[in-house]
Amino acid sequence: MTRVLHLSDTHVSRTGPDEDGVDGVAALRQLLYDVRHIPALDLVVVSGDVADDGSREGCDVVRSLVGAFAAERGIPHIYSTGNHDRREGFAAALGFGHLGPDGAPIGRRTDLDGLLAGVSEVNGLRVITLDSLVPGETHGVLGRDQLDWLAAELATPAPAGSIVVLHHPPIFVDAIPYLESVVLQEPWALGDVLAGTDVRAVLCGHLHHQLSGSVGEKPVWVTPGVVTRIDLTAPSAHARGVLGAGATVVDLSGSPTFYTLHARDPRANTEVYVYDPLTGALS
């Protein structure tokens, strides 16, 4: 069995609190402390929006905290880019995102210019990170070249199968219409590549709320955010962000299972913002 601790959306910045006034460093510290007793972890994954301001300094802080957690357990820590990240800052701190227990790079980076995608193997599990970042935009895109690279990597099965990690979920949710404009565009193209391969699960972030779905025949899991989570009890067509760091443990024995964990924060559920995602107007 391979067990993954799946984090996302740490949103740490060089200057302290994020653009909503939330201390991402404190949220990450609290979460890592509260999950310290989870046994038999093999890997930590952070699926994007590592730095709220895209800075190297923000990525450095996350690498330091997550890296220390991973080093204590002798396990790798692997990161993908998100829409808040900037490739230059991400690469300066994290390389292409695949780091061993000692912080040294592991695996291979894609040979596609400028993209921070890569592949490594952990206890027979192939871990592939994709770069869905579109600078200056909220939505994600995987171009044809990156999809062809992914197909080539998946052409040969791995001993324990594969997981794919990217920031933008390749799913639409009819009940939340605005999501279509912010998730991965043309998700069916990814589904076509994954069909018939050994991929066990697709792990994503971006939405700050736990959510399951599928792309083609493959399960998709969206982990809750570390810095804030989205409270779906907000008024119609509005998004409410509240305090309360979360994460997921992914067990890849038999059918993949996903269970969420929440930091023991007495301020959890405190409202941070309410806004209209289509216009950006605060309520």
Where do the protein language model's features map onto the residues?
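N-terminal active-site segment of His-dependent metallophosphoesterases
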Residues: M1-V61, G67, V173
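Active-site-proximal beta-strand elements of phosphoester/diester hydrolases
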Residues: T2-R14, G124-V134, I163-V165, K218-G225, ...
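Acidic/histidine-rich helix-loop elements
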Residues: S8-A27, D52-G54, L94-D111, G136-R144, ...
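Active-site environment of divalent metal-dependent phosphoester hydrolases
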Residues: S13-G16, D52-R56, N83-A91, P135-T138, ...
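His/acidic metal-ligating clusters that form di-metal
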Residues: L31-L43, H139-W221, T248-V249, P256-F258, ...
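Extended active-site neighborhood of metal-dependent phosphoesterases/phosphodiesterases
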Residues: R56-W149, A189, V193-A195, G216, ...
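His/Asp/Glu-enriched short active-site or ligand-binding loop at hydrolase and phosphoryl-transfer sites
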Residues: T223-T233
